[in-house]
A protein has these predicted regions:
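Low-acidity, Ser/Thr- and Arg-rich intrinsically disordered low-complexity segments
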Residues: 4-9
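Small-residue (G/A/S/T)-rich helix-start motifs and N-terminal tracts that mark the onset
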Residues: 12-98, 106, 135, 192, ...
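Conserved Rossmann-like nucleotide-cofactor binding loop
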Residues: 75, 102, 176
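N-terminal small/polar loop signature for handling phosphorylated ligands or for N-terminal nucleophile
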Residues: 84-163, 298-311, 315-316
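Internal gly/pro-rich beta-alpha loop/helix module
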Residues: 134-135, 140-232
Length: 498
């Protein structure tokens, strides 16, 4: 088991709230709920839930200078109701910096704070108030945002982000993030996000996830449970707490634990071959065979370790005896012919790193892979891969563009696509899982080679490709978290920790 600090959604309501929805679906959930629960009641309940979260969190003191950034719509109304609720709980340093209300609910909440000990800050004093705040609450914009933030709100967000001493809370999602908002736009940088009903998928883009902070707390502002359960899901929010090391049968022997082949390494990048092959072995593979080219063979023989058999690539004439194959780590260029031969074995194949470049070239020339396939690009590799095959960079656009594009690639290639970042996304045939990791210690050279070896091992043990990818990511992050508790570490230490 992993400790309770592993990144699992904190849900003070129900276990089905680990589903993710789009901003449009969140708006529909809100509208549907309002047919049964008045909108003002939902807003009041949201404020109460957030106040309870603050009280339980223990990070905010009663006399802290707490500044609320209040937008013109219902997110601003939530912020005002939240401020009033905290006033009722005995918090004394409450201030609000407000834009002109445009929604009726925001106007009601603006009037409602008049008789509470909440100080209004004029716009000309905004900079001073933001700089001196000990807690900043972002209630500027919510799920209805469809364009980059500009004007005074943009200035306030930039100023708030610059206040490194303040504890920052985002209501529903950090302002500046949305399905259709370019990820290069400014966004509020929260330490914790209180999101309503269900978490939003746009919060899990590689470029936006850090803005949500280390903790995302899912709260229910009295949405009827059946509406939450029935809400269409974009994907599932997974936890490394579910990591499982595959058990071995008491009568297991080396062949029953999976025989895997690895095509990796070159004269310039010999370390990738060692890391991926050792990771496959330590993850549980019974037989690991590393195929190296002529240039890297001498290094591979001495560095791969006694547990790995090393062969010349020319000896790989019969791949039928292997249960799964990994191709690409440290390969270099010009490996298209070899990759095609590997893919035509119809064995489960993991394609990583330079193998993705070779695969893109094959597909552009008309080749279509057939057989179980797992692709493991990092952000830069997916950007180049999508540009080559789809004619557009799906990573540096909007959160929706990434979800649409990665699903399109998975469908087009019949593959599981694993996007490696602070949030791992695992995608196949409309199924999408998000593994929220945020473990910077694991962001080290060779970490991806280790992950590829783990997934290879699980494929070799007959796990279905999607499950092999998901469980591989969980194990990778779990071990990384355990090592990270003791400080920074190398990929070799990560592989040995398996």
């Amino acid at each position: 088991m992993v400790d309770s600090s592993t990144r699992k959604p904190k849900m003070w309501y129900s276990s089905y709230m680990d589903s993710l929805i789009s901003c449009a679906q969140a708006q529909n959930l809100d509208k549907l709920s309002q047919k049964h629960v008045p909108a003002i009641v939902l807003m009041e309940q949201a404020a109460c839930r957030m106040s309870q979260a603050v009280e339980r969190g223990g990070r905010v003191k009663k006399d802290d200078a707490i500044l609320f950034l209040v937008g013109p719509g219902n997110n601003g109304g939530d912020a005002l109701a939240f401020a009033r609720s905290l006033a009722c709980c005995g918090y004394s340093g409450l201030q609000v910096l407000c834009m002109e209300p445009r929604s009726e609910l925001c106007r009601i909440q603006s009037e409602a704070i008049a008789d509470f000990p909440i100080r209004r800050i004029s716009h000309d004093k905004a900079g001073t108030a933001i700089d001196s705040a000990q807690v900043i609450v972002d209630g500027l914009f919510g799920v209805g945002l469809s364009r980059p933030v500009d004007g005074a709100a943009k200035e306030w967000i930039a100023r708030a982000n610059a206040n490194s001493r303040a504890w920052k809370i985002a209501i529903d999602l950090p302002s500046g993030i949305g399905d259709q908002v370019p990820v290069s736009s400014i966004s509020f940088h929260a330490d914790v996000t209180y999101t309503m009903g269900l978490a939003k998928s746009c919060m899990f883009h590689p470029a936006t996830c850090a803005s949500c902070g280390r903790e995302i707390v899912v709260l229910n502002p009295s949405f009827p449970p059946r509406f939450i359960e029935a809400c269409p899901s974009v994907g599932s929010w997974e936890s490394i707490a579910s990591a499982v090391e595959p058990p071995l049968r008491l009568d297991a022997f080396k062949n029953s634990r999976g025989s895997v082949a690895i095509f990796a390494g070159s004269r310039q990048y010999s370390g990738a071959a060692r890391l991926s092959s050792q990771a496959a072995f330590h993850a549980g593979s019974g037989l690991v065979t590393l195929f190296a080219d002529r240039d890297s063979f001498p290094v591979a023989v001495t560095s791969a370790g006694l547990s790995v058999m090393v062969r010349h690539e020319e000896e790989a004439f019969d791949l039928s005896r292997f249960d799964a194959i990994l191709a690409g780590p440290g390969w270099g260029t010009g490996r298209e012919a070899l990759l095609r031969r590997i893919l035509e074995s119809e064995k489960p194949v993991v394609v990583d790193a330079d193998g993705l470049v070779a695969l893109a070239n094959l597909v552009r020339d008309g080749y279509r892979p057939h057989g179980p396939l797992v692709l493991t690009p990092h952000v830069g590799e997916l950007s180049r891969f999508s540009s080559a095959l789809l004619g557009r960079d799906i990573v540096h656009d909007t959160p929706q563009a990434l979800l649409t594009g990665i699903s399109q690639l998975a469908t087009q290639l019949g593959a599981v696509v694993v996007l490696k970042s602070a949030v791992n996304q695992i995608v196949k045939d409309g199924r999408m899982a998000f593994l929220d990791c945020k473990n910077p210690a694991i962001a080290v050279a060779g970490s991806g080679d280790v992950l590829a070896g783990i997934i290879l091992c699980l494929l070799g043990q007959k796990l279905e490709p999607f499950e092999a990818a998901l469980q591989g990511c969980r194990l990778h992050q779990w071990k990384g978290k355990l090592l990270g508790a003791g400080g920074y570490f190398t990929s070799q230490e990560l592989e040995e920790c398996l």
